[in-house]
């Protein structure tokens, strides 16, 4: 740790480190080799003999740290005068005084503990202190940057004698929102290892509402720490940046590191997520009988908020962050010493809670549980994967957490869901990743009135009842949803050659420019790549688990265009990632998994390969089933001529709609043609109703035909292969859905969403698949390019290694700015009316006109050819025996395949329930 060298180096004493080397506990440097290990408590015990008269700092007090408190920086215009005022005349240089004008060596020996040095061993930031033979040189390095009244610094709100008359305002653009002009004063700040790090006092109005250290002491509640990162996330630790948790008198160990990634979410979505996180932390603090958690559990948890781009963050969300105390406007810098700032890092331990009244966000002071917040505001919009790089590579390396939890802004975790995820890792030492149940936010069931939301709710529920439990039973989950999942930090680390899960995961950030279409689409689902690489990590045996008791609620698209765009990325990413996993399944054999586990993985990947083939041929299979059912309705035993005519009409409209869907998908944005997509969804829904009627009608007719025979018996019904296959397929699908839902005690979606899902099934097969495969060239996440943010001031180094910064000083201004931030979300936001972009509107018009012309031309030509050649249904009068036989065989294969896959999923879900019951019994014996 680096300090300014203060006072005369000739100072000596009976317990001086120079006189008694055994008392020297400073961090090693080239001039001072590493000493034997000393227990941290001994460092505190040696305070008694020292001449320093300082109050003893507790573990939670921020002792000497490499940040500069902005309220203690002296006016550069009166620099010489203040130098004479504060520098004592005696050579003692303040020896024995209760401030920072003391020997930094002795202060270091008394308060700093070697095992928690934030700097690499052997990399001391300053040269060794001058020897006794060297003359004393009162250069600028000997002038203290900070001169507080105690070991913790002065109280920022009661310090008298601060003279602002000589301060000058910096002639720079006013930041937005504009603070009071007198708030902007120019101060000189010494860079720490070339990095700009500031301790900023929080507004007195905020401080008055929360417990904090009494003056003149300071703690994590009185100051917000700002760091201007000028490096890549992977270089954060190497550039000697650190975080507040490592700077306490006794550095805190992080058990749980939670990241909330956001883009431009409003204050309601952000507050919803943070309220859920706060409740989880409070839950863990209330577990008084736990071996790991308890009253002080919040000290083991750090909540990191990463915002993707300074120009993208919602101003009202930023105001909520300011209300929590973890953001202050006007502190950030554009450049430091000529280097562009890549991220603005704010740290604060908040005691302010949040609450929602409808859609209105309000603050709740004096929260029972403090929360350590880390807010990283990225300068540029670089997508979510870059936000995870800051979380894992930058902050994770400094804090070295045990478990990392990933949450998207807008996802609300259950009151104990984060704890339930953590418990899965605690019970299973080889659990490398876990996920919970993602629920659709239904607003007390009101959103179920939207068929699209109801369909997605059913899809999510069945995935959490059949798919996730099945995969968890085998030990490999194809995807841990990025909206709510957790990883063991050590399991993600790369090997000594830099190869591993994180290396593969972050590869997708920079490869789009020169990668092939296959690889680029694969990295649209980089979380799937991470899951596979984690399980197949060389010489390891990590597994993935599904935690049913951990839930996270999230919003889903409620309009067709947004839904299509979302599924385009999901389908393309999941399909190509599945191909990658199947092609690299051999990597599982280089792991340390048992032979039985590897065999289970092989069975699971075989199952996934079959599913992948069904997904590839889904559009063809659906058409064939449609053709067979409509053809069967045209026989004399069923509807006769009426059935034939209806079949021809539906087939024409089917092919025309399918063709139109291809045309729209290849050149039009769903946002530009919402009515066209809505019409297609309506047609496919009507078609599914028709097919459902056809299935039921044919089943009834088959039973009637068998009953009318003279030698009828109940067993003869099942001798009909077509009827038996249809019954088995329907029973294995729909009946097992009901049974599995009741086994998981979650059957309500079967009564509220089942019909909507059945009706919209053709939309999933045709519209979504066609749009996805027709846009495999689109490797974006559906967000536009980065908007340019307002330019911030820069911090350039002056002679002497100092920089000028704009800092807050006046209590009135701090309160005024704090009030202005609170007012931003104190009222309901005005209804946003998105004005269409003229360029996009014109482009949509041209593409829509092109699509309509091409569609009309192709349909008219198709009708002409069909009528002249008497094909495409006109020749369907008699069904040949061979054609009938082939159709029967094909239909039987499809129906029995569906039955087999459904039964396989049901078996896996039942096994998951058995294992879960056993785990609960184990947990009840050894509570954590």
From Swiss-Prot:
Mutant phenotype after disruption = Leads to dramatically altered cell morphologies when CHS1 is also disrupted. Does not affect virulence when solely disrupted but the virulence is drastically reduced in a mouse model of acute infection in a doucble CHS2-CHS3 disruptant. Leads to increased expression of the other chitin synthase genes for compensation.
GO biological process: one example: chitin biosynthetic process
User: Which GO CC terms are listed, alphabetically?
Assistant: cell septum; plasma membrane
Q: What InterPro entries does the database record attribute to this sequence? A: Chitin_synth (IPR004835), Chitin_synth_fun (IPR004834), Chitin_synth_N (IPR013616), Nucleotide-diphossugar_trans (IPR029044)
The reply on keyword Transmembrane is: yes
Kindly state which keywords UniProt assigns to this record, in alphabetical order.
Answer: Cell membrane, Cell wall biogenesis/degradation, Glycosyltransferase, Membrane, Transferase, Transmembrane, Transmembrane helix, Virulence
Location in the cell: Cell membrane
Top-level taxon of origin: Eukaryota
Q: Top enzyme class of this protein?
A: transferase
Question: Which molecular-function annotations from GO does this UniProt entry contain?
Answer: chitin synthase activity
Q: What conditions trigger expression of this protein?
A: The expression levels changes little with temperature change, regardless of whether the exposure to the higher temperature is for 3 h or 24 h.
Where do transmembrane segments lie in this chain?
472-492, 570-589, 613-633, 644-664, 678-698, 723-743, 753-773, 854-874, 893-913
What topology in the membrane does the UniProt record assign?
Multi-pass membrane protein
Note down the stretches annotated as region Disordered. Answer: 1-45, 110-179
This molecule's function is given as: Polymerizes chitin, a structural polymer of the cell wall and septum, by transferring the sugar moiety of UDP-GlcNAc to the non-reducing end of the growing chitin polymer. CHS2 plays a synergistic role to CHS1 in normal yeast cell reproductive growth, even if this role is less predominant than for CHS1. With CHS3, plays an important role in virulence.
Q: Which family does it belong to?
A: Belongs to the chitin synthase family. Class I subfamily.
The protein in question is named Chitin synthase 2
Q: What is the lineage of its organism?
A: Eukaryota, Fungi, Dikarya, Ascomycota, Pezizomycotina
């Amino acid at each position: 740790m680096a300090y300014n060298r203060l006072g005369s180096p000739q100072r000596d004493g009976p317990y001086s480190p120079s006189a008694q080397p055994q008392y020297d506990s400073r961090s090693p440097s080239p001039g001072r080799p590493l000493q034997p290990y000393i227990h941290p408590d001994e460092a505190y015990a040696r305070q008694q003999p020292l001449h320093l008269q300082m109050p003893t700092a507790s573990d939670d007090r921020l002792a000497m740290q490499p940040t500069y408190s902005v309220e203690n920086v002296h006016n550069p215009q009166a620099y010489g005068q203040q130098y004479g005022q504060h520098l004592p005349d005696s050579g003692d240089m303040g020896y024995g005084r209760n401030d920072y004008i003391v020997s930094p060596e002795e202060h270091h020996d008394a308060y700093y503990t070697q095992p928690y040095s934030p700097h690499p061993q052997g990399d001391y930031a300053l040269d060794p202190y001058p020897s006794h033979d060297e003359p004393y040189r009162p250069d600028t390095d000997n002038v203290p940057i900070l001169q507080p009244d105690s070991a913790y610094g002065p109280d920022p709100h009661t310090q008298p004698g601060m003279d602002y008359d000589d301060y000058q305002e910096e002639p720079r653009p006013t930041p937005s929102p504009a603070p009071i002009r007198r708030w902007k004063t120019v101060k000189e700040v010494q860079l720490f290892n070339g990095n700009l790090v500031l301790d900023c006092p929080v507004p007195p109005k905020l401080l008055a509402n929360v417990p904090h250290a009494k003056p003149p002491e300071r703690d994590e509640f009185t100051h917000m720490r700002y760091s201007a990162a000028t490096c890549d996330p992977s270089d954060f630790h190497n550039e000697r940046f650190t975080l507040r948790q490592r700077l306490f008198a006794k550095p805190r160990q992080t058990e749980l590191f939670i990241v909330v990634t956001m883009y431009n979410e409003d204050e309601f979505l952000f507050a919803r997520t943070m309220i859920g996180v706060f409740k989880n932390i409070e839950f863990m603090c209330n577990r008084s009988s736990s071996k790991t958690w308890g009253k002080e559990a919040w000290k083991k948890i750090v909540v990191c908020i990463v915002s993707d781009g300074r120009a993208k963050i919602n101003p009202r969300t930023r105001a909520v962050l300011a209300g929590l105390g973890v953001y202050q406007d006007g502190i950030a810098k554009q450049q430091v010493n000529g280097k562009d700032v890549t991220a603005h890092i704010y740290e604060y331990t908040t005691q302010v809670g949040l609450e929602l009244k409808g859609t209105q966000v309000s603050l709740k002071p004096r929260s029972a549980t403090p929360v350590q917040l880390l807010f990283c505001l990225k300068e540029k919009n670089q997508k979510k994967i870059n936000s995870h790089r800051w979380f894992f590579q930058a902050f994770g390396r400094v804090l070295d957490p045990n478990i990392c939890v990933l949450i998207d802004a807008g996802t609300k975790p259950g009151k104990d869901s984060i704890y339930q995820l953590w418990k899965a890792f605690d019970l299973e030492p080889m659990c490398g990743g876990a996920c919970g149940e993602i629920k659709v936010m239904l607003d007390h069931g009101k959103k179920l009135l939207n068929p699209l939301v109801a369909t997605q709710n059913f899809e999510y529920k069945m995935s959490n009842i059949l798919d996730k439990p099945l995969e968890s039973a085998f030990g490999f989950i194809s995807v841990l949803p990025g909206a709510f999942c957790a990883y063991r930090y050590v399991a993600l680390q790369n090997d000594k050659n830099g190869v591993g899960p994180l290396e593969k995961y972050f590869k997708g950030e920079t490869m789009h420019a020169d990668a092939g279409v296959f690889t680029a689409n694969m990295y649209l689902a980089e979380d799937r790549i991470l899951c596979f690489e984690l399980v197949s990590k060389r010489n390891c045996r990590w597994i993935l688990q599904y935690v049913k008791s951990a839930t996270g609620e999230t919003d889903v698209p409620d309009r067709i265009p947004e839904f299509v765009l979302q599924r385009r990325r999901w389908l393309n990413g999941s399909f190509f990632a599945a191909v990658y996993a199947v092609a690299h399944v051999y990597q599982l054999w280089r792991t340390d998994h048992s032979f039985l586990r590897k065999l289970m993985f092989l069975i699971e990947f075989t199952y996934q390969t079959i599913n992948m083939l069904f997904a590839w041929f889904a559009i063809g299979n659906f058409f064939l089933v449609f053709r067979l059912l409509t053809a069967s309705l045209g026989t004399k035993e069923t509807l006769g001529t009426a059935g034939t005519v209806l079949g021809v009409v539906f087939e024409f409209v089917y092919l025309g709609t399918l063709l139109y869907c291809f045309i729209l998908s290849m050149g039009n944005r769903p946002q530009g043609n919402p009515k066209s997509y809505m019409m297609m969804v309506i047609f496919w829904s009507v078609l599914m109703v028709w097919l459902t009627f056809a299935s039921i009608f044919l089943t009834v007719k088959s039973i009637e035909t068998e009953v009318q025979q003279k030698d009828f018996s109940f067993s003869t019904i099942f001798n009909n292969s077509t009827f038996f296959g249809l019954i088995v397929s329907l029973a294995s699908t729909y009946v097992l859905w009901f049974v599995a839902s009741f086994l998981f005690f979650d059957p309500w979606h079967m009564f509220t969403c089942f019909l909507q899902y059945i009706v919209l099934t053709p939309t999933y097969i045709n519209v979504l698949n066609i749009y996805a495969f027709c846009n495999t060239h689109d490797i974006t996440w559906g967000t536009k390019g980065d908007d340019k943010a307002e330019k911030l001031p820069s911090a350039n180094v002056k002679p002497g290694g100092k920089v000028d910064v704009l800092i807050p000083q006046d209590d009135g201004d701090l309160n005024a700015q704090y009030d202005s931030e609170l007012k931003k979300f104190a009222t309901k936001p005005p209804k946003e009316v998105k004005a269409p972009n003229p360029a996009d509107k014109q482009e949509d018009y041209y593409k829509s006109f092109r699509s309509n012309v091409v569609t009309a031309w192709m349909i008219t030509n198709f009708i002409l050819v069909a009528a002249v050649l008497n094909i495409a249904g006109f020749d369907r009068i008699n069904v040949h025996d061979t054609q009938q036989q082939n159709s029967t065989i094909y239909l039987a294969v499809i129906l029995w395949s569906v039955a087999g896959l459904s039964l396989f999923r049901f078996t896996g879900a039942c096994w998951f329930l058995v294992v879960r019951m056993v785990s609960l019994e184990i947990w009840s014996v050894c509570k954590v």
